Amino acid sequence: MNPFAPSAPLGGCLSPVIVALDFPTDADTLEFVARLEPSQCRLKVGKELFTASGRKLVDQLVARGFDVFLDLKYHDIPNTVASACRVAADLGVWMVDMHASGGRRMMEAAREAVANCSVRPLLIGVTVLTSMTDEELAELGLPAAAVQVERLARLAQSSGLDGVVCSAQEAAALKNLLGASFKLVTPGIRLADSAADDQRRVMTPAAAMAAGSDYLVIGRPITKAADPLATLTAINAGLAAR
């Protein structure tokens, strides 16, 4: 499998790497982003950063040529999620996600809301957060992660989403089950010499791609690096050499 195979690129990025912008302010974010290249990665804006900085920051990132994954994990009534996805599409984001546990009607409403957008973002379902253990799922009355992930991934696909967020440990089974065109977005990616931090189900970039992941969300190993672009370039080179 070619790790740089294109899939709905907006800014021409062929790397599978999505850098998680886990910064508290837009000033910190833009200072960091100035050290990156849009051809080398995409960017993820999560809840903390979006709450602090809002759509203005997303506009700035898109204007700089980056594909943006708006990681707000929508989970609400169908009409509300549909409206939010339509606004996200108007922002020009490349990808947006929602909890698959919100159900079929919610996901179908989201799909229909962006179907006629001039640039349609990829719609991704969140299955089981990579921070959660089987014991924590059991406390919620849910089955083990592998079972719940498969159940929600099937539901997301049949509801018309483009892919799901899953750990690399689940990627191979999901790729075999749901097919090559259904995109797998994998957080919990760490370099060989990195700590797991708050992610429980983690894997290295090469191992995750070999397992079937299409996109790799990488945060601290890049954002905390002395030379983020050099680290990113090394990751991409390692993946291209597979």
Swiss-Prot record:
**Keyword Protease set for record:** no
Q: What is its EC number?
A: 4.1.1.23
Tell me which UniProt keywords the record has, alphabetically: Decarboxylase, Lyase, Pyrimidine biosynthesis
| Superkingdom | Bacteria
Looking up InterPro entries in the UniProt record yields: Aldolase_TIM, OMPdecase, OMPdecase_AS, OMPdecase_bac, OMPdeCOase_dom, RibuloseP-bd_barrel
**What PROSITE patterns does this protein map onto?**
OMPDECASE
GO CC entries? cytosol
Entry annotated with the keyword Lyase: yes
Q: Specify the pathway.
A: Pyrimidine metabolism; UMP biosynthesis via de novo pathway; UMP from orotate: step 2/2
Family per UniProt?
A: Belongs to the OMP decarboxylase family. Type 1 subfamily.
Give the protein's function.
Answer: Catalyzes the decarboxylation of orotidine 5'-monophosphate (OMP) to uridine 5'-monophosphate (UMP).
Q: Which PANTHER family match?
A: OROTIDINE 5'-PHOSPHATE DECARBOXYLASE (PTHR32119:SF2)
Note the subunit structure.
Homodimer.
Write down the HAMAP family for this protein, in alphabetical order.
Answer: OMPdecase_type1_B
Q: What is this protein called?
A: Orotidine 5'-phosphate decarboxylase
What organism, scientifically named, is this protein from? Laribacter hongkongensis (strain HLHK9)
Classification of source organism? Bacteria, Pseudomonadati, Pseudomonadota, Betaproteobacteria, Neisseriales
